[in-house]
Swiss-Prot record:
Keywords for this protein: Acetylation, Electron transport, Membrane, Mitochondrion, Mitochondrion inner membrane, Respiratory chain, Transmembrane, Transmembrane helix, Transport
Gene (name only): NDUFA3
Residues passing through the membrane, by range: 19-39
Any Gene Ontology CC annotation: respiratory chain complex I
Described function: Accessory subunit of the mitochondrial membrane respiratory chain NADH dehydrogenase (Complex I), that is believed not to be involved in catalysis. Complex I functions in the transfer of electrons from NADH to the respiratory chain. The immediate electron acceptor for the enzyme is believed to be ubiquinone.
Source organism (scientific name): Homo sapiens
Recorded family membership: Belongs to the complex I NDUFA3 subunit family.
Protein name per its UniProtKB record: NADH dehydrogenase [ubiquinone] 1 alpha subcomplex subunit 3
Topology with respect to the bilayer: Single-pass membrane protein
UniProt GO BP: aerobic respiration; mitochondrial electron transport, NADH to ubiquinone; proton motive force-driven mitochondrial ATP synthesis
CDD domains linked: NDUFA3
Region (Disordered): 56-84
Length: 84
């Protein structure tokens, strides 16, 4: 089986080296990002960043889930990012 794959790759390289290189570069573009040390931090930042940003509303006192001010800290802290 490995001999057949090797023969196929040699034949492909002989006939269309540009396509082989483009497939290798595309494959590396898919495989390498999760191996990067920055991948861990980008995942942590994306988890801590709110998807929905607060909308200013007039608080009548009966809305416990609405912060009193739009800049009140809520959700996960980003202190770990400041300490890098």
């Amino acid at each position: 089986m490995a001999a057949r794959v090797g023969a196929f790759l040699k034949n492909a390289w002989d006939k269309e080296p540009v396509l082989v290189v483009s497939f290798v570069v595309g494959g590396l573009a898919v495989i390498l990002p999760p191996l990067s040390p920055y991948f861990k931090y980008s995942v942590m930042i994306n988890k801590a960043t709110p998807y929905n940003y607060p909308v200013p509303v007039r608080d009548d006192g009966n809305m416990p889930d609405v912060p009193s001010h739009p800049q009140d800290p809520q959700g996960p802290s980003l202190e770990w990012l400041k300490k890098l």
